[in-house]
Amino acid sequence: MQIHVIKQGQSLWGISQLYSVPYPRLVDINALEQPGQLAMGQTLLVPTQNRYTVQQGDSFYSIASKTGVSILELRQANPQITGNVLYPGQVLRIPQKPKPTTLVNAFAEPYPKTVDYARTAAKALSWLSIFSYHVDAAGNLRPLEDETLLQVAKSNGVKPLLTITNIKEGADFDTELATTILTSEQVQNTLINNVLTTMNQKGYSGVNVDFEFLGIENKERYNQFLRKLVQKLRPQGYIVTTAVAPKTSADQKGVLYEGHDYQAHSKIVDYVIIMTYEWGWSGGPPLPVSPLPQVEEVLRYALTVIPKNKLIMGINLYGYDWTLPYVEGGPFAKALSIPQATRLAYTKQAEIQYDQEDEAPFYTYYDQNRKEHIVWFEDLRSYAAKFNLIKELGIAGMAFWNLAFPYPPLWILIQDRFQVKK
């Protein structure tokens, strides 16, 4: 598969002719609802069978990044090119090598559209983490209508994971609720029994524990709870994972970070999912949601205390649209799916740029009130860069938040670059 970046004046018909790929297949692979409306800088996935057609502005470095091979491998496969100059239209051979095996998890909430998106993604998934069973102060689980998502997972060979959270009813992740749970043996025992009963009754394959904003006072209490949970579930063959905040040191300050003990989790649970996104978030200044240098910094620290075969990178399926100038405490940025972001770029006649350092696409536009906006999001290039990092570090896999934001070409790209563990 080749990643093509739309240039000025290009049409899907012209791209189909350039690559000798049927027009309907390009529409299908990229799930294009309006194939005549392509934004400048938008990325498309093109089936090219181990060859790459050079685009304007390409270099050996950019082609290696897009295709997931090294510059050396690319040069060795194309000895006819002796210098560094490449010309648009040149066809390079892309060497084939065994695909690395990876775990792919996606979080999904049980809404009708999300169920449809889960069906689309299923072939590229190892796990489906159904979000979420809220835990109350007595250790009870708030009921969740998860039957349809469970059926989608099981019918596609995907292991469903039950996600439990300390989300307070009608609110968000709650420190006080977590403290109530983690300071009571009785509440914890009730919770563990409820988790086990629900998994047995519904056919879950494991649990993901997503307790957030714990504070330092709950760090060791949380570790102890996880030990008790694993002691109860592991003998029955259940997978146990945790979702943790992105840290670059063990003593990183802040209520979001201090309760998550990377090293302890790595010794207790089967896998640790690091939520490596939200540098750019809806209430903060405009930034890439998951800039690759910062993601890499977190993962490289994590690898000093977590075995690589237990470490999973979190990846966002969305971007944000900020109104400029950013004012602290002002209106929150609007979340967008990748198709929404590219459609908006087309509508506003904005050219999508690409930040090579952060490995993230962005663009600016003016709304009807002449207010400037900036949109940071993801595309096939930024995902390919993240996949290259996963391969380089040799970590266990990736976890996507969340399937409410559809992007069908992504699941095809994953299967092109990896052997998905089922």
Predicted features and spans:
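Primarily a LysM-type cell-wall glycan-binding module
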Residues: 1-19, 42-68, 90-92
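Glycan-binding loop/region signatures in secreted carbohydrate-active enzymes
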Residues: 163-178, 317-386, 418-422
